[in-house]
Regions:
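Membrane-embedded hairpin module used as a gating/binding unit in multi-pass transport
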Residues: 224-305
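An acidic, phosphate/nucleotide-engaging active-site surface
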Residues: 129-196
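Histidine-anchored nucleotide/phosphate-binding helix
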Residues: 92-112, 312-320, 326
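C-terminal non-catalytic interaction/assembly regions of soluble proteins
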Residues: 9-11, 108, 314-429
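N-terminal amphipathic/basic leader segments beginning at the initiator methionine
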Residues: 2-64
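Glycine-rich phosphate/diphosphate-binding loops that line cofactor/substrate pockets in enzymes
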Residues: 68-84, 109-114, 289-295, 320-321, ...
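Short glycine-rich or small-residue beta-strand-to-loop segments that form or flank ligand, phosphate
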Residues: 82-93, 118-124, 298-301
Length: 429
């Protein structure tokens, strides 16, 4: 009889050990069940908030009734002529289709008609969305009844000023022309600004390449020790983009903290700094994942940020024994996200922050094994040297390859949604 796999507990005396993995965000999202040798000492490392309850519609409504640091949306909106709602793209798990109807209801209470409301996909340096993707993100009713635009990182901007650190603030022309600017996004771990969310929906979301590049490259270069995963307090990149968002006139942000099923665990409405910090404090309690020591082998699921799968590798840097191996579960049909700042666009060149491929993306690992249905030669090169990156479509063959090296007693960590997880950070980090 199969035994249930409990979180962070070694499973013994089972014919096979099974763990469920969620895969393919936004594209036929589903769960797959993978098996592991019973002889392995398997530990599933779940985030602290794995079983936190999701918010009801009433609780979501209450968050809109009591914003943080600002009046209600309906009160801010009274007398405004043009409204823009910024939303993030499919590289983020924000259930905008769930949140934006509450925003529209507030605007309706202020007497704002639909033809005075526009929505802009604030994807920064990512790619635009096609209609079906907009429907996935926003819902069919919104796409059919409101004007929805993609941002353009290279054209149609208005220069509104310069931050004290020298970042030129060039903002999407459609956004700049509105007298009420509302952002909708999510607060999830981020490798340079500490956490996503807050002002990031405006910068980089709706900013020009000149703005984004300066904030990403020059600010980061000047203060490298102050940026990083989970670092929000006094983070120069975040402080700079918050100043830029203020110059751009961002009025209010709605941020969610979600679980691995895109269910809303926390919702924070209001001033893009104040609500963000409260959201980060809650996100730390949700996404923080206990360090269970050192491991011979680590299995990391790239879900839900599968288009940026390198974000799943942080547990290996923290807990993999030197010379150990990493298995990446990467079940997405879209592959690596096209990114105009860091992406590859030729045989030996790319965006302004592009790095030449070469060393393995996990310095302390011996090999990287990727479980993927589809992949390209370019993606394989992106991960590192060909003799250290191995791609498998068949899970059983992958396990058979690992077994001669990782036999009985191998200590194995499994992170079921690694791109959503992060270390446990102290308060005010």
């Amino acid at each position: 009889m199969k035994r249930k796999v409990m979180p962070s507990i070694t499973t013994e005396k089972a014919e096979r050990q099974f763990i469920q993995f969620r895969v393919s965000l936004w594209n036929n999202e589903h769960e797959i069940k993978l098996n592991f040798p019973q002889e392995w000492k398997l530990i599933e490392c779940r985030m602290a908030g794995h079983d936190f309850p999701s918010l009801s519609d009433l609780q979501i409504h209450e968050a809109f009734e009591k914003p943080i640091g600002t009046p209600r949306i309906r009160d801010i909106a009274r007398g405004k002529k043009k409204v823009v709602i910024l939303f993030d793209d499919l590289a983020r798990p924000t259930p905008a289709y769930k949140i934006i109807p509450f925003v529209l209801r507030e605007l309706g209470e202020a007497g704002i008609e639909p033809d005075r409301i526009k929505l802009v996909c604030a994807y920064g340096c990512h790619r635009p969305l096609v209609r079906q993707e907009m429907i996935k993100k926003l819902g069919k009713e919104i796409v059919e009844n409101y004007l929805v635009f993609n941002h353009n990182v290279y054209e149609h901007h208005v220069k509104l000023g310069t931050t004290s650190r020298g970042t030129p603030v060039l903002i999407n022309r459609e956004v700049a022309g509105c007298d009420l600017k509302i952002g909708v996004g999510c607060i999830i771990p981020h490798f340079t600004t500490g956490y996503g969310g807050g002002a990031k929906i405006m910068v980089p979301g709706a900013a020009a390449m000149e703005t984004i590049a300066y904030n990403h490259i020059e600010i980061e270069k000047a203060y490298p020790e102050h940026v990083g995963l989970g670092k929000v307090k006094n983070n120069p990149r975040r402080v700079d983009l918050e100043e830029a968002a203020k110059i751009a006139g961002l009025d209010l942000v709605v941020n969610v903290v979600v679980n691995h099923r895109k269910e809303i665990l926390g919702l924070f409405v209001g001033d893009f700094v104040e609500q963000h910090r409260k959201g980060v404090a809650f996100a730390n309690k949700v996404y923080g994942t206990e360090n269970r020591g050192k491991f011979d082998l680590m299995v990391l699921n790239a879900f839900p940020i599968e288009e940026s799968p390198e974000k799943a590798l942080w547990p290996a840097e923290e807990s993999l024994k030197r010379g150990g191996d990493v298995v990446l579960i990467w079940q997405t049909t879209d592959g690596i996200l096209p990114h105009y700042l860091v992406g590859t666009f030729g045989s030996d060149y790319g965006g302004r922050k592009w790095q030449r491929p070469g060393t393995l993306r996990i310095p302390n690992a011996k090999n990287l094994f990727i479980y993927a249905e589809d992949f390209s030669k370019l993606e394989k090169r992106w991960w590192g040297p060909e003799d250290r990156v191995f791609l498998y479509r068949n899970w059983e063959k992958l396990i058979d390859t690992l077994w001669p090296v990782h036999g009985k007693g191998t200590r194995v960590a499994v992170y079921p949604y690694a791109t959503l997880q992060c270390p446990i950070f102290p308060d005010g980090y």
